[in-house]
């Protein structure tokens, strides 16, 4: 028997056994309610308000992008990332992985996207606040820094805007941290979030499922090493071109990087 098929059958058997054993346990996962469960919204807003109140913080994350081939087979690409924020108007993010190597710098006046691999960068004037700049980058430049959904001061409003239902899944442990898992649905995207229990309701895991894309690929972010008491200098957010770096327009950044390969 093919080893992968054998392994898959063993997984199914283990899951079936676990379901039988847990039949007498208290139910953690409940039937999905119509609309958004008030408790799920309360937990999400508590997280959002807590993060909005952190003036400076840093984090490390592992993101996984799932790609569906025309054959239906799925591939995953991993990208470790670091992120530093100083409210109300500074951001530095670096994502380096299997298919990307990008740095984002926002110093309150300008936004810069840098590709260290090809030594290319693009710079443009930016709005005066982080929230406005995140919208500007997404809507005008079609660029998104890692985990930006969580950085808005009104993150909960942004995340719930397109959601039609949501509920509390139950307790879960993420990276050794006790969390509560929430699940939400929208017309085009389903998403889940794991929020740390206790007096620091930090997001620890985030999954987006694209339902309108063939194969329903997922994007997963596992967040670790939070420092909500970080002391960051302005130098952290200032971009200084490396020797020989080539300045180009934002619209040409991806094309130039592809041409250099």
In which residue ranges do the predicted regions lie?
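Intrinsically disordered, low-complexity boundary segments flanking structured domains
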Residues: 43-52, 150-155, 207-210, 234-235
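N-terminal secretory signal peptides that target proteins for export/translocation
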Residues: 1-8
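Bacterial N-terminal signal peptides
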Residues: 12-24
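A short, polar/proline- and glycine-enriched secondary-structure boundary/capping micro-motif
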Residues: 70, 102-106, 115, 123-125, ...
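Gly/Pro-enriched, hydrophobic low-complexity segments
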Residues: 35-38, 62, 112, 122, ...
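Sec/Tat signal peptide C-region and signal peptidase I cleavage site
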Residues: 24-31
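Flexible, processing/modification-adjacent segments and terminal tails
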Residues: 32-43, 71, 75, 110, ...
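N-terminal mature ectodomain segment of secretory-pathway/periplasmic proteins
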Residues: 35-120
């Amino acid at each position: 028997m093919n080893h992968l098929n054998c392994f898959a059958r063993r997984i199914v058997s283990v899951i079936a056994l676990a379901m039988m054993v847990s039949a007498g346990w208290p139910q953690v996962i409940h039937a999905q309610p119509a609309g958004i469960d008030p408790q799920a919204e309360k937990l999400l807003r508590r997280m959002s308000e807590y993060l909005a109140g952190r003036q400076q913080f840093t984090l490390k994350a592992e993101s996984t992008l799932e790609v569906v081939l025309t054959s239906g087979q799925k591939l995953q690409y991993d990208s470790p990332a670091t992120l530093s924020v100083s409210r109300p108007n500074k951001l530095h993010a670096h994502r380096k992985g299997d298919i990307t190597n990008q740095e984002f710098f926002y110093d309150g006046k300008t936004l810069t996207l840098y590709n260290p691999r090809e030594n290319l960068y693009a710079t443009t004037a930016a709005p005066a606040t982080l929230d406005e700049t995140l919208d500007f980058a997404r809507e005008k430049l079609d660029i998104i820094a890692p985990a930006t959904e969580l950085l808005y001061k009104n993150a909960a409003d942004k995340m719930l805007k397109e959601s039609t239902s949501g509920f509390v899944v139950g307790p879960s442990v993420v990276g050794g941290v006790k969390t509560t898992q929430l699940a939400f649905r929208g017309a085009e995207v389903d998403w889940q979030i794991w929020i740390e229990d206790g007096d620091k309701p930090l997001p620890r895991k985030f999954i987006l499922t694209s339902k309108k894309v063939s194969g329903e690929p997922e994007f997963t972010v596992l967040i670790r090493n939070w420092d909500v008491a970080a002391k960051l200098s302005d130098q952290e957010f200032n971009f200084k071109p490396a020797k020989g770096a080539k300045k180009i327009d934002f619209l040409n950044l991806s094309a130039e990087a592809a041409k250099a390969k």
